[in-house]
Amino acid sequence: MDLAGLLKSQFLCHLVFCYVFIASGLIINTVQLFTLLLWPINKQLFRKINCRLSYCISSQLVMLLEWWSGTECTIFTDPRAYPKYGKENAIVVLNHKFEIDFLCGWSLSERFGLLGGSKVLAKKELAYVPIIGWMWYFTEMVFCSRKWEQDRKTVATSLQHLRDYPEKYFFLIHCEGTRFTEKKHEISMQVARAKGLPRLKHHPLPRTKGFAITVRSLRNVVSAVYDCTLNFRNNENPTLLGVLNGKKYHADLYVRRIPLEDIPEDDDRCSAWLHKLYQEKDAFQEEYYRTGTFPETPMVPPRRPWTLVNWLFWASLVLYPFFQFLVSMIRSGSSLTLASFILVFFVASMGVRWMIGVTEIDKGSAYGNSDSKQKQND
């Protein structure tokens, strides 16, 4: 391990990142709270401000991926479609297999200049996660309870609110509804056999209702669906802790642009279309495992400096008073004060570890572990 790699693996560096993220995140969340005063006066101004405040938080995690760990991303796509990326609203359908697939989705949004306004269809519990969940609330993320009778109304209403959103955005949706595990996959394939659907080797069955209502609600606002299939070279299974430790990965992302007018408007036909899409995604994934590459032309969208600039700004803003406070405590010589400081720092680091745990596969939700629930929510 070289000197840089040794430095990146040090717990002290991780504490610095944790402190900057927590301190800046809570400051930004507080500012977002006060922006609620703008909502009844000027809703679009509220949205533009929160779009930029959201960037200040989410870009810190993208900075860790792109600049700290040095993870690279190669996009395989049609060169004729590439110029449209970042210039239009799009629904992004991304496979949900890796612990950092959401971070790769953010990186894609950042490289095309849409990170601040990016949206996602997320489980309702995430709205209560400090900093990121609260940030999502203020940027009008669409939350679902995974109970269709409730979601058919609440999700549709939330999506309708995005029809006049003033910023360009990618709307990310994991149609599988849950992260891939062997157990969930086997249960899903039991449902596939019961429904007479082809077996998928690398994906669970997609949940079609959420996709259909998203397409229906955003039609004539969103220009296309971006079918994205993610994999990592050398058969690696990256983790957020690995990124924090500075481990470098190389992501390969196959992106197909599908005009929204090519997707059926009827819900049943739209569901059949999505099942066919996932059969194609499965074939692309199988080809990747066999050949180590995806179809189409490989391209590397350049990383932008703004994630690093943003982190340096917040680091200088919150670290300087912190070190002043630390020096004053050391000079005071009070054992009780120092012990209290260490306790607070320990609790903060455990809090960040808990937030990281939300992304870990072995600590993921039980959603998808019951075939009866899958049949109900498909």
Curated annotation (Swiss-Prot):
Entry-linked InterPro entries: Acyltransf_C, Plipid/glycerol_acylTrfase
Listed pathway(s): Phospholipid metabolism; CDP-diacylglycerol biosynthesis; CDP-diacylglycerol from sn-glycerol 3-phosphate: step 2/3
SMART domains, per the entry: PlsC
BP-aspect Gene Ontology terms: CDP-diacylglycerol biosynthetic process
Motif HXXXXD motif location, chain numbering: 96-101
Subcellular location: Endoplasmic reticulum membrane
EC number: 2.3.1.51
One Pfam family here: Acyltransf_C
Record-level GO cellular component terms: endoplasmic reticulum; endoplasmic reticulum membrane; mitochondrial outer membrane
Superkingdom of the source species: Eukaryota
Reactions that this protein is recorded to catalyse: a 1-acyl-sn-glycero-3-phosphate + an acyl-CoA = a 1,2-diacyl-sn-glycero-3-phosphate + CoA; (4Z,7Z,10Z,13Z,16Z,19Z)-docosahexaenoyl-CoA + 1-hexadecanoyl-sn-glycero-3-phosphate = 1-hexadecanoyl-2-(4Z,7Z,10Z,13Z,16Z,19Z-docosahexaenoyl)-sn-glycero-3-phosphate + CoA; 1-octadecanoyl-sn-glycero-3-phosphate + (9Z,12Z)-octadecadienoyl-CoA = 1-octadecanoyl-2-(9Z,12Z-octadecadienoyl)-sn-glycero-3-phosphate + CoA; 1-octadecanoyl-sn-glycero-3-phosphate + (4Z,7Z,10Z,13Z,16Z,19Z)-docosahexaenoyl-CoA = 1-octadecanoyl-2-(4Z,7Z,10Z,13Z,16Z,19Z-docosahexaenoyl)-sn-glycero-3-phosphate + CoA
Record keywords, A-Z: Acyltransferase, Endoplasmic reticulum, Lipid biosynthesis, Lipid metabolism, Membrane, Phospholipid biosynthesis, Phospholipid metabolism, Transferase, Transmembrane, Transmembrane helix
UniProt GO MF annotations: 1-acylglycerol-3-phosphate O-acyltransferase activity
Topology of this chain in the membrane: Multi-pass membrane protein
Entry's free-text remark on domains: The HXXXXD motif is essential for acyltransferase activity and may constitute the binding site for the phosphate moiety of the glycerol-3-phosphate.
Role, per record: Converts 1-acyl-sn-glycerol-3-phosphate (lysophosphatidic acid or LPA) into 1,2-diacyl-sn-glycerol-3-phosphate (phosphatidic acid or PA) by incorporating an acyl moiety at the sn-2 position of the glycerol backbone. Exhibits high acyl-CoA specificity for polyunsaturated fatty acyl-CoA, especially docosahexaenoyl-CoA (22:6-CoA, DHA-CoA).
Similarity section: Belongs to the 1-acyl-sn-glycerol-3-phosphate acyltransferase family.
The name this protein goes by in its record: 1-acyl-sn-glycerol-3-phosphate acyltransferase delta
Source species taxonomy: Eukaryota, Metazoa, Chordata, Craniata, Vertebrata
Gene: AGPAT4
